Amino acid sequence: MKHLRLPVVLAAGTLALTACAGVGNKDAGGGSSSQGSADSTPSGTLNIMGFSGEDEVAQSRITAFKTAYPGVTVKNNKGDFDAQQFLTAVSSGNPPDVVYIPRNLVGTYAAKAAIQPLDDCIKNSGIDTTQYREAALNEVKLKDKTYGIPEFYTVSANLISGKSLAAAGVAVTDIQTTDWDKLEQTAKKLYVAKNGRPARIGYDPKLPDFFPLWAMANGAELVKPGGEPNLNDPKAVEALEFSIKLVNDQGGWANFKTFRDTFDLFGAKNQFTKDQLAAFPIENWYVNVLLDSRSSGLQLQSTPFTDRQGQPISTIGGSAWVVPKGAKNANAACQWAKTMTSLETWHKAAEARMQTVTKDKSFFTGLFTGNKKADEEIKAKYLKPTGDAGFDQAINNYYDVLDKAKSVNPSAAGAEIDAAWKAAVGKALAGSATPKAALDQAQSEAKAAFDKAPQG
């Protein structure tokens, strides 16, 4: 039942991507290399890459497409997106027809001509782009062209072990990100060491992955609206300094990471039930994972992640359907993207999820589709009080931040910018560079990549 939206590792080959050939006219798949029209019926073979498609939310939507278009043979090369595999397929002139990729990579692939604009697909197939959440749609655009059809919408909130807080005499309201000095004191109070090493982390800032969220909380924008990197903004430097201080207060990076790596994040006996962690910010998919932990004594609590003015905020994550240059069945690919993300299909996915919920004798934790109307209607129809106040609060915190969440601006050098800040945070955590020096170097490298990048 666990529908997980996990980060995808960026293969090194992405950064070496060069411009790819244009759209091919030959159609070995028996379909159409054009993006179709509202009255065109796709046929032939649809080759998909990057889509695991194992759970009921995915399977119900695949079934919806196959039912609507029985003339299409769907071939899904199951597995997460692999950049090197994708680039090899594109450069060889034998790309898949549709690819499922993290939205933060769309700008890079669009700028370097590995994927094609979908404006004709959207127009000809009558895709209503107003149904998608604006922040998600923003991530798949470059220079006023749309290169992907978005789906899913991961946002963050603080999840908390009520047991850990009770043992330390800490109130749930003390897990807050508005007052950083108070958060540091709370983390220290919750932190437990044995033999000089962490035995319980008080508050995990989730570095390196959550650096963009901490920067946003401090008012920094890591990528400017035009796509130019802004990694060494003084507010970003301050955010990195603070979040690293939280780590250093709790054993230092080497000990902290070694201990954190022992967490059984997906197990019923995880870091919360084993009292290894008091609190951390994490995405909405994790609430569904924690359902199995209730029988192991989990006492879940939650607070929103806020900026320093006390307003709930979140970065967003999610995926997109893109059509590579040279796709042989772009018409079927377009209809696939439309069908998979439509209001009607999301309702079928929600029905499938509820069947699983009923079978598991569990409860609905939300479905965050990236389709605003679908989110609202599914929530109204299926979200009920769970009987567990902590889970109710967590679910509500995730829903409440949906309209406030912001994407990192798309960039023609999005992959390079992403790699640069991750390397910088790694250096700063390891102590091989100060946060400022690390981000200065990252900015220099990212800016050079941006200046060289084709702008779409």
Predicted segments with their positions:
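Extracytoplasmic ligand-binding clamshell segments of periplasmic binding protein
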Residues: 83, 220-293, 297-305, 438
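Hinge/lid segment of periplasmic solute-binding proteins
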Residues: 104-156, 182, 299-303
